[in-house]
A protein has these predicted regions:
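Short, small-residue alpha-helix embedded
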Residues: 68, 123-154
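Short, charged, surface-exposed loops that flank catalytic or proteolytic processing sites
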Residues: 72-80, 141-149, 167-171
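Short pre-catalytic strand/loop immediately N-terminal to key active-site residues, enriched for Gly-Thr
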Residues: 113-125
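Hydrophobic alpha-helical scaffolding
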Residues: 10-11, 124, 137, 166, ...
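A short structural micro-motif
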Residues: 76, 154-157
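Feature representing long, continuous alpha-helical segments
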Residues: 83-86, 131-132, 178
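Glycine-rich phosphate/dinucleotide-binding loop and adjoining beta-alpha-beta core of small-molecule
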Residues: 1-116, 185-186
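Charged C-terminal helix
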Residues: 157-191
Length: 191
């Protein structure tokens, strides 16, 4: 029994993966985070399976993945990001964490916008790292939407802290792990 499962990172896109996602959606009763190949699998084989879910679902697409999930162009999404995101989250009763220069987190009714991340996060592995943060914080309180937003805020703060020591162009996503305790302490001290 796991309180939260994250899947999709590097698993590939296939009908077998779709069957696994479908099984989890219909049988797992806690929180399921779907990222990367998991999102692309839903886009290819049918996003409507989300309507059959028994669990809480967090989707973490970047704009390209979201365009594939919704069948809406990237340009259209960028023009109407809040409206399209809220409608999608409401329609599928999920939390959507739409990653871009800013990150929009919504459940369709309430939304957060994270603007504190640096461009240094726009590189391979950053989405996986963020999914890991969300995985770790998803059940810290009863407010799942807030927990996802807090994960994004921490992710942004990690990039800010790391940039004080490491040039933005040299920063590796794995470098962020060195700053987690410092950022968490800073947040706790700010209370």
């Amino acid at each position: 029994n796991y309180d939260t499962i994250a899947l999709g990172m590097g698993i590939g896109i296939s009908e077998e993966i779709y069957k696994i996602i479908k099984y989890l959606l219909q049988n797992y009763t806690h929180t399921l985070i779907i990222d990367a190949d998991g999102l692309n699998t839903l886009a290819k084989f049918g996003v409507s399976v989300l309507k059959t879910k028994k669990c809480k679902v967090i989707l973490t697409p970047h704009i390209g993945e979201f365009a594939r999930l919704t069948n809406v162009s990237k340009d259209e999404i960028l023009k109407n990001e809040l409206e399209i995101s809220e409608e999608f989250a409401m329609n599928f009763d999920c939390i959507l964490c739409l990653k871009n220069n800013t990150t929009l987190i919504t459940d369709g009714y309430n939304s957060y916008l994270n603007i504190n991340a640096l461009p240094s996060l726009a590189k391979a592995g950053s989405g996986d790292f963020l999914s890991g943060l969300i995985l770790g914080l998803a059940n810290k309180s009863e407010d799942l939407l807030f927990n996802v937003a807090a994960s994004n805020f921490i992710f942004g703060l990690l990039s800010v802290e790391a940039s004080k020591d490491i040039d933005e162009n040299s920063l590796l996503i794995t470098d962020l792990t060195k700053y987690i305790s410092k950022v968490i302490r800073r947040i706790k001290d700010a209370k």
